[in-house]
Amino acid sequence: GFNSFDNTLLAAMLRTEKRHNSPPDAIRRLAAWLSPVVTHDGSHKILKKVSDRLALSKSERLRLKQLLFPKHKLQKEFTVTQCRKILYFLDDPVAFYDLALFQAAMDDGNYEHWEMIMQLPHTNPLPIFPIRGEDILALGVKPGLRVGELLAMTEEWWLQRNFSDDRRSLLMHVKMLLRS
């Protein structure tokens, strides 16, 4: 319970913030403090209790939840391409930075690698997926679920190819999917 908190991760977070010249952040620190208990408990109950008790705002609760129960985890062995995909799915450079700093604290070392990952939104900005539903409709596909399926398959193909294809080649890929 709350009586036996392990402050190891919190201490690592303080070192990591300092090492990366990151301003102190209460939500990240709270996540580091709560992480051992939440991880052990495996539920959102403690998260809700603490959030209610501290009267956290909706956005603070969301940040805390994203740090403690991330949909996408960064791993130190991830390539730049894998990290870019997570950045793409998060679609939020601040959330990506939070997650990278949190993982760096959990790793508590390997600072150069994590610094490179944290800087990814600035050094390697992500392109916007260049096609939309109306592009699929313009190819003669009737409105409906098939449009979304084609978009999702094409986006996955684009991600697997490290965002390298432009609008023209993506539309050619959709045409190929339509023929198959």
Walk through the language-model features, giving the residues of each.
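Conserved, hydrophobic alpha-helical core segments of structured domains
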Residues: 1-109
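Charged substrate- and nucleic-acid-binding regions of tRNA-handling and nucleotidyl-transfer enzymes
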Residues: 100-180
